Regions:
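Conserved, well-structured ligand/cofactor-binding cores
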Residues: 1-98
Length: 99
């Protein structure tokens, strides 16, 4: 792999694409579970992003996270929703968290 960076997690070091917005665990899932070579549909990913933003707002109201944390999550969600970031969600649709 050219143009990579080294990421570290509890399982050790791993090379991931330099521009990737994900880390070692996602790369391990991609490498270890090439089941269907189909990615999660963009509509599902967008719905999940909206759910994460809503959860952040609720958790701010419930004082489970700070306002700054909630704002950061909502801002990140808005960036993901308005840009073209689907390449950064590479895990196979049938990989179910076992990686």
């Amino acid at each position: 792999m050219s143009n990579t960076r080294i990421e570290r997690d509890s399982m050790g070091e791993l090379r991931v694409p330099e521009a990737a917005l994900y880390g070692a665990q996602t790369q391990r899932a991609v490498d270890n579970f090439p089941i269907s070579h189909q990615r999660m549909p963009a509509q599902f990913i967008r719905a999940l992003i909206l759910a994460k933003a809503a959860a952040a707002q609720a958790n701010v109201e419930l004082k489970q996270i700070s306002a700054a944390q909630g704002e950061a999550i909502v801002e990140a969600a808005q960036i993901l929703l308005t840009g073209d970031f689907m390449e950064h969600f590479p895990v196979d649709i049938f990989q179910t968290g076992s990686g």
